[in-house]
Amino acid sequence: MKIGVFIPIGNNGWLISETAPQYKPTFELNKTIVQKAEHYHFDFALSMIKLRGFGGKTEFWEHNMESFTLMAGLAAVTSRIQLYATAATLVMPPAIVARMAATIDSISNGRFGVNVVTGWQKPEYEQMGMWPGDDYFTRRYDYLTEYVSVLRDLWGTGHCTLDGEFFKMDDCRVSPRPQSEMKVICAGQSDAGMAFSAKHADFNFCFGKGVNTPTAFAPTAARMKTAADAENRDVSSYVLFMVIADETDEAARAKWELYKAGADAEALSWLTDQSSKDTRSGSDTNVRQMADPTSAVNINMGTLVGSWASVARMLDEIDTVPGAGGVLLTFDDFVEGIENFGRYIQPLMKTRQHIGIEQKEVA
């Protein structure tokens, strides 16, 4: 099972809480995190893109770095780990993204890929006059399909000519091209998003569900597998979980209860309000799950709370779900969390026993 880290490109990571660790994103912080992840043989690191936050007392996600430039820097200070940046496709022309990606491919020696997002938070784009109107909610995957076709053409052949609805390319060129096949990933959870991923993505991210229910995402993975099978493609699901771990179950649970008690109500209200703006998509979108009041304090990603052994056991359970290819992890404290994961949790995981063999070979 592949394991990646969803690095904290925005302040406070993924905990919307006054009692969680409070910090701003910096290159040095993310360098430390990704280098630790590489040391402990994580398979990949992903950074999101966020152009406006949720406010509140914690100013949640009001302080964000830019994804491609951050990953370019991280590419230069790592050697093995796969790196993914996120393209905000509404404000980043595909020909420019194709060239930036090819450049980072060169910096990383072929370890780079691109996560594409359509954009759901209207104020991110309205603030710069680039929101295309609310009809976009129903057309966003049509837009993304053209966008990715431009990327694939430029990376694959070095040129693109397209007379599309959203993009006009007249012998557009990119060179040098990537030395390795450029992976495109997506996080489609709605029917439209999964249909897109089934046709165009190399793998698809989805949310884990609940607290200490590691296989509850199985119906989502099954939907993705069905959609991919219909396209005769293999598109596995990579599942997003937060790990809150300690030496004992009781100590880990105490952390989780503390974070929930300090939930930033004002920031959560903003999230709920923004999730209601899209009245045209179905009820199965990512943002609908993020705003669910059940566990909005960490945007309702799956949460694994427990001792080193408990978390290791639950992570192994994820691998039993058909269609699951890996996990994308966040932590309450990333530096400490990855260190503890590498030293205490991963050695207990049956699905990561090959790591011990690799470490001996490196030594």
From Swiss-Prot:
Enzyme category, top tier: oxidoreductase
CDD domains named in the record: Alkanesulfonate_monoxygenase
Annotated FMN binding sites: 49-50, 115, 124, 140-141, 190
Catalytic activity, EC: 1.14.99.46
Record family assignment: Belongs to the NtaA/SnaA/DszA monooxygenase family. RutA subfamily.
Function as written in the Swiss-Prot or TrEMBL entry: The FMN-N(5)-oxide reacts spontaneously with NADH to produce FMN. Requires the flavin reductase RutF to regenerate FMN in vivo.
NCBIfam families the record matches: RutA
The protein's name in its UniProt record: Pyrimidine monooxygenase RutA
Source taxonomy: Bacteria, Pseudomonadati, Pseudomonadota, Gammaproteobacteria, Enterobacterales
